[in-house]
Every structure is written in structure tokens, then in C-alpha cells.
Amino acid sequence: MEAMNMNIPRDAMFVPPPESEQNGYHEKSEVQQTSYMQSQVKVPHYNFPTPYFTTSFSAQELLGEGFQASISRISAVTEDMQSMEIPEFVEEARRDYAAKTRENEMLGQQYEKELERKSEAYRKHQEVEADKIRKELEKQHMRDIEFRKEIAELAIENQKRMIDLECRYAKKDMDRERTKVRMMLEQQKFHSDIQVNLDSSAAGTESGGHVVSQSEKFTERNREMKR
């Protein structure tokens, strides 16, 4: 830190000489007073200390008689800080670590229990749902069997009806054919041509004949059909 240099300004107050000086002899008296104030700002930091500044100035200069100040700068340097082993803090850290370990284990156990509880509840719920689905599938299977039986019976019944229908109309066709044959037999017509040729060395003989035979048998049914 540099000291302040005091300079007396020109407009300083004039002090009249004392009476002894007026009476013929001189007595010189001069009083000089200097005072200063100093302020320091320190910001301690464990890792990187910051620089701080000191300022000094005269109180008289603050009153208007001029201002002159010197500033000295102190640069900060990095200091190696060693950890202090305090038994109380060591014991407290040990207790905190043990408590944290216990709480961590408790959280893990709670998580496992909650996971097991939810898994068991879900498993039971799924078993109930699976049993419901199984029973419903069994019912559906029985319904499918009944449906297939009904379809098979319906198909068999339909085939029987179709067979009966075919038989009925086939019988009608047979009846018509039989009737037609009977009618053709009742109305017979016989037609024959006979021709004989005899040829020899002495003479030749030729003989021929034509025979037509027709008979009709009328019955009451034929008359109705003709009508």
C-alpha cells in the first residue's frame, strides 16, 4: 500500500499572526493533520479464491481539499486445500450411508413385494378370465355340434323329400308308359307281304300275296281318352 501525499491547495484559509508577532517579534506555528480510512473486501473460496482490492484515502480530501488515492492490487493464487478429517462428520457420514443403505434395501423390498402382489393379482384375474373363456368355448363347441347335427338332419330330410318327389313323378311316367303300351296292344295292326318265286329249267312260277289284318278293341277307357 502506498501512503497518501498531502498537497496544500492555494485557497487554504489564512490565519492572522498572533499579537506577539504584531508587537515586533515573529513566532511561526504550523499544524498538519493527516488521517485515512481503509476498506477491504475479501471473498474467500475454497477452490478458486477471487482477487480483492484495498483502497486508502484521506478523510480531509473527502471534504473537498483535493482527492488523491493509491490502489494496490493483490492477485489471488490457487492454494491446495486438504480435506480435514473431523470425527463428528465422519461418524455422521457413516450413519447417513448406513441409513441410505437400509432405506435403499427397504425400497427394493417394497418394490419386490408390490411387484409380486400385482403379479399374483393379475395371474388370478387371468385364471378367472381363462376359465370363463374355456367354459364359453366349450359351450360354443356344443352349439357347433348341435348346429351341424341340425344341418345334417335337414340335408337328409331334404334328400328324402327330393327322392320321394323323383319317385312320385317317375311312377307317373311309368304309369303313362304302361298305359301307352296297353293302348298300343289294344289297337293292333298287322301288315305282311308274301312273295314266292319258283324258277326252273322247264318253267318259271311266281306267286305273291298281300295280307292286311287289323283289329281294334274299344273299351270304356279308350273312349274317354279319345274324347
UniProtKB/Swiss-Prot annotation:
Q: Which GO terms describe its cellular component?
A: cytoplasm
Q: Where would you find this protein in the cell?
A: Cytoplasm
Q: Which GO terms describe its biological process?
A: response to desiccation
Give the intrachain disulfide bonds: none
- Asked if Transferase is a keyword of the record, the answer is no
Q: Where is this region: Disordered?
A: 1-28, 198-227
Additional facts recorded: Trehalose, a disaccharide essential for several organisms to survive drying, is detected at low levels or not at all in some tardigrade species, indicating that tardigrades possess potentially novel mechanisms for surviving desiccation involving tardigrade-specific intrinsically disordered proteins (TDPs).
Give the protein's recorded name. Cytosolic-abundant heat soluble protein 106094
Q: What organism is the protein native to?
A: Paramacrobiotus richtersi
